[in-house]
């Protein structure tokens, strides 16, 4: 369908011919009329290894600067890189390509680009080939996608296919590439809801760039089929290119692997720590690595069978056995993977990702734990942060990482401790699960291994080893980590908000919202535009519709002498809908009526104070805990509010106190709160992506709010000065999930009431204990110590009482076929006392003890000695039936059971029934 898209004058004007590759079937363009294959692996092997394709070797910084300078000279504006965590997106967690920086707002035409045309070197993270990293010689988790982009509209074309190809060809020529060796392979591209013609740029068997001409959008009614999906033409059309920085460096050096090309000093350091002699000047060793990378380029090695086939082919080509080759390659591949993964973590944590069990944090923890496992296997005993420091030393162009290193180090140390605890706990958990499958004779399914990793952090290698020790078979795919990473890389699709009366709302103009310009005004006049059921739409309103964690305004609407109570305010597609308390027989309001609205001022101001306090607390938390703090959720109420932030450990009381003091300092400074509607691109360039702490708002214009040092995109209502917030009191902190801390607080009058409640609690406690408030802590501590001593004494007395009872109970035992049965009701005994007594009674193996008591309900404890169990006694079954007779439940093992209920009237019958059941079991 896209064949016409490739009829480009650049090719015909520069001596290219179009051919079809006999191996893959794709069409490609080449200046070499003798060439038959497309130049891409596996159709062509890596010929650049040991034979660099450019005129000189370039290191990463040099190649990056060469590229960016080249495009600046060609009229492009260089822009700064975006973070690897896609803060401006709610559909992906990680930045996976340079074009992701400009989706969805720029690519859709809603927002102008930061420059046009532009050039960038964007660090990206893709974990879909995680298991191939190290093994293939070419795969990376983190890479820089150098790019030049042009955003064309129907009114203005910057440049399109012709100039894009000219620029690419010119860049390669300036690097010293042989024009006859470069091929352009046709390969339609699709992704992120867009598609277009694309050419892959190849040299020496290596793809070094991709040139996408994005001019299609996904459309089920479209007429263009690409990879099974239908597309239609876009009004705008975009040049989306990607040049692999690391691949270009590798091609310039011709190193055996990409890892030796891009971080050789770190590879060598790690090889030394692992006790591996990594001497690339050794021709035999270098030949093994080179041959492995060459042949790996010819196949997908994510599958175990393909990896084994690769081993066989490489071994045969160099004259050694596959086992010998594996013994050489596996440790080296692990070192390569560690070097790659730690660079990935440098960007992940350096850009603010906090390891956790959800979203981007899950992916960071996945990489951390895979790295730690490989380090352990190789005997590399240094902290992972030391390797991160090596990378930071090699990345002076990213000074932000060095500034954040103390936090990066603290996070990683915390993760290492957690992983050690997980392994200890996980082995026991896995053994239990494996025994279950062994008893049932089943093979352990992959779903169980994934659940053990997802829910409990147990690495699949540990699960497989433990299961194997127990004698349970496990099929573990070689691409396990890639599968898990893919599963967690896409954000959950948001449920679309159901719009009631959508047909009526669609015909209405957007409501003018007055509360932004006049935040202190509470009365307004308006015209009724529509009435349906108990919902009213006005031409303008001062009532704030629910959003951004702020509840809806309430108030009244008055028409003539009738006052209608507004109990909810919502907004749908810019139309604000006011909900009246109830549907009356006849709603006293009609379309076209003039109404007087009044906002419930007390509720509004309570919400505004708490919303402004949320911004103040967020900023204070960042100052106390570190720049990695990121808002993950917030909710405001009239009497309190809460803020959820990403943080890798519990907030201490001292830290909470500091946050509270700093927040109140901001209040006392009485700073003016500044709000402004700004162009999205301008706001992002000025303030960065911290704008989107509270979420990513749609549209070209966004409302930017500055509260003290906190600057965010926010559409809520606020105080006009920080002083109007009043006192802020942090009520508590708690960990709501791994990696997320919640602060709960109150502001203004609500804070005063909260503090008064605390004072009342302290005063009442002091009066109860008859001490002053200052003496409360020491008095409570003394009482607690005394309570512990009394508890010890009580336990001792219970043991003595149980011991003294035992002899009497043994004397009263009934003999049934050589088994001595003791059934007894013991008044006012708790479960602990019953258990101790029953335990002593059954120290003799032919004794069965069933004891019952009434204390906070009915308690039942039964035990049986070994001989009794061998004779068929099962006290678990007996206690189960007894418990139903006293209005409860219970059960247990044949030798030990507990139960109880709420109906003491059934105790005698239950005890009698226990004797009958015992005799049945023994006969």
From Swiss-Prot:
It catalyses: tRNA(Ala) + L-alanine + ATP = L-alanyl-tRNA(Ala) + AMP + diphosphate. Pfam families: DHHA1, tRNA-synt_2c, tRNA_SAD. It is found in: Cytoplasm. Binds 1 zinc ion per subunit. Its EC number is 6.1.1.7. SUPFAM superfamilies: Class II aaRS and biotin synthetases, Putative anticodon-binding domain of alanyl-tRNA synthetase (AlaRS), ThrRS/AlaRS common domain, Translation proteins. One of its GO terms (cellular component) is cytoplasm. One of its GO terms (molecular function) is alanine-tRNA ligase activity. The keyword Metal-binding applies. Residues 886-909 are annotated as: Disordered. Residues 886-903 have a biased composition (Gly residues). Its cofactor is Zn(2+). Zn(2+) binds at residues 611, 615, 714, 718. CDD domains: AlaRS_core (cd00673). The keyword Endoplasmic reticulum does not apply. GO terms for biological process: alanyl-tRNA aminoacylation. Keywords: Aminoacyl-tRNA synthetase, ATP-binding, Cytoplasm, Ligase, Metal-binding, Nucleotide-binding, Protein biosynthesis, RNA-binding, tRNA-binding, Zinc. PANTHER family: ALANINE--TRNA LIGASE, CYTOPLASMIC, ALANYL-TRNA SYNTHETASE. Catalyzes the attachment of alanine to tRNA(Ala) in a two-step reaction: alanine is first activated by ATP to form Ala-AMP and then transferred to the acceptor end of tRNA(Ala). Also edits incorrectly charged Ser-tRNA(Ala) and Gly-tRNA(Ala) via its editing domain. Belongs to the class-II aminoacyl-tRNA synthetase family. This is Alanine--tRNA ligase. It comes from Methanococcoides burtonii (strain DSM 6242 / NBRC 107633 / OCM 468 / ACE-M). The gene is alaS.
